[in-house]
């Protein structure tokens, strides 16, 4: 099977059950509706005749001039046997540069440590290009969720603070 990405882009949909506009939200309607088509903001890549979800277009993070899909890094981290679940966010350092921050909930019995951070960082680097490896790691007991059970990224972002130095960071 070929690993070459043939096409990538944003999904547009239309159909008989599509709403013609957002209720009392002309701004949202203008951003989303393209004639008869609805801009979903969901990015996909076609590979070997299948379409793979990459993430939301507005989730893309630019790190050192390179675009990173948080979902790709999350999938890689979630494959590590010590990780219960995780979220990857953009984090602004005090010098205004952006860095990837992995918020990790470890499985029961695994302790957060500098060695654990090094292990997870090396795991990501062994599967993804080095710039996709998070610089910052934060360990939490539980990842906050929305009412629908999705990761509450806004809650994670709100509690995030700029960090000067990333050496050995874990909390």
Predicted segments with their positions:
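Short, small-residue-biased leader/transition segments that mark boundaries at the very start
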Residues: 1-5
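AMP-binding/adenylate-forming catalytic core of the ANL superfamily
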Residues: 15, 20-21, 28-31, 41-132, ...
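Glycine-rich active-site loop/lid that clamps phosphate-bearing ligands
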Residues: 11
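Acidic/polar alpha-helix N-cap and adjacent early helical turns
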Residues: 158-171
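Short, small/polar residue-rich loop motifs at catalytic or cofactor-binding pockets
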Residues: 38-40, 138
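AMP-binding/adenylate-forming catalytic domain of the ANL superfamily
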Residues: 126-150, 168-171
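Catalytic tyrosine of NAD(P)H-dependent dehydrogenase/reductases that use a Tyr as the general acid/base
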Residues: 22, 38, 149
């Amino acid at each position: 099977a070929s690993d070459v990405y043939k096409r990538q882009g944003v999904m547009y949909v239309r159909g008989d059950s599509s709403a013609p506009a957002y209720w009392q939200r002309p701004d949202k309607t203008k951003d989303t509706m393209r004639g008869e088509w609805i801009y979903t903001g969901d990015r996909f890549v076609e590979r070997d005749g299948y379409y793979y979800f990459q993430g939301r277009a507005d989730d893309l993070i630019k790190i050192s001039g390179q675009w990173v899909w948080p979902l790709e890094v999350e999938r890689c981290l979630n494959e590590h046997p010590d990780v219960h679940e995780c979220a990857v966010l953009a984090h602004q350092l005090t010098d205004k540069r952006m860095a990837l921050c992995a918020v990790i909930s470890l499985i029961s019995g695994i302790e957060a440590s500098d060695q654990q951070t090094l292990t997870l960082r090396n795991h990501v680097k062994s599967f993804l290009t080095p710039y996709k490896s998070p610089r910052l790691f934060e360990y939490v007991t539980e990842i906050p969720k929305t009412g629908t059970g999705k990761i509450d990224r806004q809650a994670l972002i709100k509690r995030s603070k700029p960090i000067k130095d990333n050496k050995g960071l874990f909390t």
